[in-house]
Amino acid sequence: MNSAFQPISAVIICKNEVRSIRSVLRALKGHVDEIVVVDSGSTDGTLDVVRSEGLEPVFHAFEGYGKQKQFACSLATNLWVLSVDADEVISPELGQELQEFQGSSTITAYRITRRFRFLGRTFKHGHGASDLPIRLFRTDYCRFDDAEVHESVKVEGEIGLVDGEMLHESYVDLAQYLEKFNRYTSIAAEQIVNSGKSRSVVLTGLMIPFYFLKNYVVWGNILNGTHGFIWSVLSSFYPFVKVAKAWALRKQ
């Protein structure tokens, strides 16, 4: 371990995240040495909130999640970067760890436990209730890939795990869910078209009941009550909608 604490830059990309961005920023304050916010054209008051928290957002046209996050990392002035989504709130325990972070001579990236929250309820059961994304890393050994969606960090070196957690407040209401659902399925549809692969709209549509059973029963969301049921129903339509959008794009 190093003898001195390592300075950390938190980097956030956002667009129209007025519902959650303030709590994200306030949770970070006092625990990291720098906060970088990259916005791709918010129109809902997000920029006003960021500025009211004493930060100046940087505009960068959206090129996909991987490239956008890598651009944000390039603005960081510290070697260690904490990548935080605009709907992720770090816990006080994680904040304390970040303040006392000393780094490692061999570990270049750390995973952080992320708890999933949907419509005000933290899921405690089933697939997706929590995951371990790489969120803290050295920018000289790690970088985001160029994926348009479902981006990941490429790591050179060992990967560790920190004890603290972050809360993924993905969808505070159904309007926000549907907004993101529409955005993600549109990106996924473009990827399908660009890949040249053909998928049956009819077959994918007929699979919706099976996707629901997998989400609700096999993956254990039945244990998350009504919230788990709603999540399972909505998620079951994702494959069909992205394939249907790809079909529509090809017809244009």
Language-model regions, residue ranges each:
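Acidic helix N-cap motif at the loop->helix transition within catalytic regions
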Residues: 19-22, 44-53, 93-94
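Short, acidic, metal-binding catalytic loop of nucleotide-sugar glycosyltransferases
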Residues: 26-35
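Conserved donor nucleotide-binding strand/loop of the catalytic core
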Residues: 33, 47-75
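Cofactor-binding loops of NAD(P)H-dependent oxidoreductases
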Residues: 60, 84-86
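Catalytic-site signature of metal-activated, phosphate-bearing donor transferases
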Residues: 67-73, 79-84, 91-252
